[in-house]
Amino acid sequence: MFRHDTPAEADFRMDVRTWLEANLPVALRGRTARPPPVELMPWYHKLSRKGWVAPHWPRQHGGMGATLNEQIIMTEELARIGAPQLPAQGLNHIGPILMAFGTDAQKAQHLPPIIAGTVIWAQGYSEPGAGSDLASLSTRATLEGNHFVVRGQKIWTTWAHHSDWMFALVRTDPQAQPRQAGITFLLLDLHSPGIRIRPIKTIAGDDEFSEVFFDDVIVPAENLVGKLHDGWRIANALLGHERLATSNPQFALMALERIKTMARASGIMADPTFQERLAAASIDVTALSALFSHAVELNNQGQSLGPESSMIKIFGSELLQALNDLLIEAAGGHALTDRPIATDFGEVDVAASFLQSRRVTIYGGSSEIQRNVLARRVLNLPG
């Protein structure tokens, strides 16, 4: 959005655009709600066969090994056609973590199925008493010989009832101080005995999230990632990837297109005041794209994102909410309906888009927590 393609990049963009037009099912285009894995995986498999499912992964692990600019081009073209987000927990979260911290055996076991789309991953972080204050987690894992015994509960776990594996933070030393020092990073087979999964109906009407209960679940010791009690350090590395993924400008670009579609249909596009607000929103989306590209470049160079991950999480999530507020304004009275609105310019599900945007400032670290991080780490304020 803020740069010009080289001739080679322009050719690559046209290749991506042409292939997406020919291969992305119409039923998946422009979907406001994230399709469940059962609907999404055929598209995932098609991208995998093309070699495009993981542009940011190195070739040695089955990825595309794309340059930064190629990754940006793919993000823009996926947004342009309204492609749905792929399951992020495998591609953007545990995959990069295993590349950095996993054993050779863990990489060999788990990375190829992520690329192939034969295994779906869930993230086991939040608990009923530990959300933004994640260090308060209480799910216990006791090492007994060559295995751990896990007891406890996770909540707000995305697509757990469709997943095969979970990466989770568990408490292995309840006496450790600070609390972060007693946390370990484990891989759990969700088909193991003692695991119960209960979907949660959300305000948007979907059941994307679940509660997960662990009743004396046996986890082999070789499923430990990194060292015992060192999970917090790994989790911090993962949070950088997660905040990058949740602030991907693809979502903002798609929201901007929904606003334009709705504004043309309602007639408000001719209003100068609305045009001014839309222009300001477009500038913010361009700024997010620039910030995202900078963060991706640091990440690709193996550098820690540090405070940048908090900055992009705040800006990206709050911008998405602001865009959906503008979508409500563009829809006018039509925003009161609880079903997609058919227009001459395409279908827009205004209510679902608005409701789903409410949670983005909470998951992955709330805006309040991120501002505290910036206050401490950038401004050197106490707390």
Each predicted region: which residue ranges?
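Amphipathic, small/basic residue-rich leader segments at the start of a protein or domain
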Residues: 1-88, 109-116, 245, 265, ...
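C-terminal helix-coil-helix/basic helical segment that borders enzyme active sites and/or dimer interfaces
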Residues: 28-35, 268-275, 286-342
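Internal helix-loop-helix
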Residues: 49-108, 112-118, 159-165, 285, ...
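Glycine-rich beta->alpha junctions and the first turn(s) of the following alpha-helix
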Residues: 2-5, 195-291, 353, 360, ...
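Glycine-rich phosphate/cofactor-binding loops in nucleotide/flavin-utilizing enzymes
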Residues: 2-5, 69, 73-74, 93, ...
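A short, Trp-centered hydrophobic/proline-enriched beta-strand micro-motif
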Residues: 117-125, 169
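A short core secondary-structure module
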Residues: 146-147, 151-198
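A structural signal for short hydrophobic beta-strand segments in well-ordered beta-sheet cores
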Residues: 139-142
